[in-house]
Amino acid sequence: MISLIFDKSNSFNPQLCVELLNHFKVVMLTKTIVVDYPSFQAWKAQLKPFKLAVFSDNLQTELTPNSKLTVFNNYQQLLVDNNDLIIFATPTLVQLFDNEIDQLIVINPTSKSKDQFNCNWNDFVLIKQTNFKNHQVGYFDKKSSYEPPFTVVTDHFFGNLTDLFSLLVDKKVSVNDVDIGLISLQYLNIIANYTNKKAIEKITDYLVITSKILAKKADNLLNDHQEESVLEYDLATNNFRDKMIANLVEHKRYCDSLGEFEKLRVNRLAYFSKANEMEQFIKTANDQLVTVEDQLPNYISVLKLFHAMNKLLEMRLSSLLTNKNITIKELSVEQVQKELVLAIKQFNYQTVSLKRVLLKLNHPISLMYFVTAFVALLVLLNNQVIGLEQKDYHSELYIFLLDENQLKTFQESPDEMVKRIQAQQQQNELIIAKNKQLRAIKNKQKRADYLKKKYGENYLDKTNLKDENNN
């Protein structure tokens, strides 16, 4: 998302700049701030903690690009490398990014703002007005019939709902500071303004994410009550016991609702997808033995990695944001490699799960992207750019960037090679047998549900009938 902060005077005084940076500090730390060269010179001290992109026609030699500073004179190149920008509007930058703006944040909006800021105001809709310090702020989102904008606006956050959820997962924002009621009202406003067939996909995605935040907050509040049990316990009236029971019932209701929303969303997607397309992809390596002759460096098993990716895909099936509109998109393995490495670098060479790395990406994860990411991981592993940690077939994938000190080359003896291959074959046979067993249980349960639906809840299958006769 490209957000442009616009002051009614079309310029920022130093005091206003400091107030803005303090007010939106949490969300600005996750984005790239774009300023022109004069603004950078004036606000250099205040902008130091943030990732910056400085526009300069002459590419001033005193500016040394580094991990936190980019110097550019071509805005198109900047957009290729950055998807999330916050632009401090000056006349030069407004002219550059006029057609690329997704969101306007107007300081002290007035009826004359439209005359002072030269853009097509008919393309934007006012989402909310809020206050901070001595200023009013108006949030305007670009209208779109394909992807309705859901910009969450709270006291200390503005941005996409997916960005807020990512910050909550990384614990950069406390779930106790999130006003669920405020987010729900903004969600209802989105439904009221974008009720059409093209927008229903995004609206259901937002519902699932909002439900996850709600369940996370309910779980957190439940833990807080448990810590205060000693103080609130009242033996005579059992006030604490009654309160805990009410909280548990409410928490279960939130969790059940989340599962139901995800189930309904997946069922709706099934009407627009090919039959068993997803299941066929997942079962590819589970129904038959796959022989892999060549191993990755350090004898990492390709089959082991493939099975772990399948398990991750099954868990993320309900949250994959699949666009059903027919579009042509270029997606290369090299591009995905670059995005994965940049996401891993944000964890400072620490070992991190693949699930958290995917949450760091700046766009929704589609099925096509997920499959391409698997190929990109194979290439990165083969080139020894990243390392992989995984205990067994069922454990989660953990990856990290390799440096020269971590690069190791193992040389197996013939006996060790035979033992490793035999162990891999045994693991492979065990996992296939277990998958067949789980599939049989699943088919049996599916048949029982069908018969109960057809003949009523009182229907008893053969197993239950034997139990009844024995009793």
UniProtKB/Swiss-Prot annotation:
Answer whether the UniProt record assigns the keyword Cell division to this protein. Answer: yes
Region annotation (ScpA) maps to: 143-471
Q: Name one GO biological process term.
A: chromosome segregation
Q: What is one term from the GO cellular component aspect held by the record?
A: cytoplasm
The source's domain of life comes to Bacteria
List locations, semicolon-separated.
Cytoplasm
Instruction: Please state the span of the N-terminal signal peptide per the UniProt entry.
Output: none
Keywords (alphabetical) are: Cell cycle, Cell division, Chromosome partition, Cytoplasm
Q: What does this protein do?
A: Participates in chromosomal partition during cell division. May act via the formation of a condensin-like complex containing Smc and ScpB that pull DNA away from mid-cell into both cell halves.
- Partners and quaternary state? Component of a cohesin-like complex composed of ScpA, ScpB and the Smc homodimer, in which ScpA and ScpB bind to the head domain of Smc. The presence of the three proteins is required for the association of the complex with DNA.
Write out the similarity annotation.
Answer: Belongs to the ScpA family.
User: What is the designated name of this protein?
Assistant: Segregation and condensation protein A
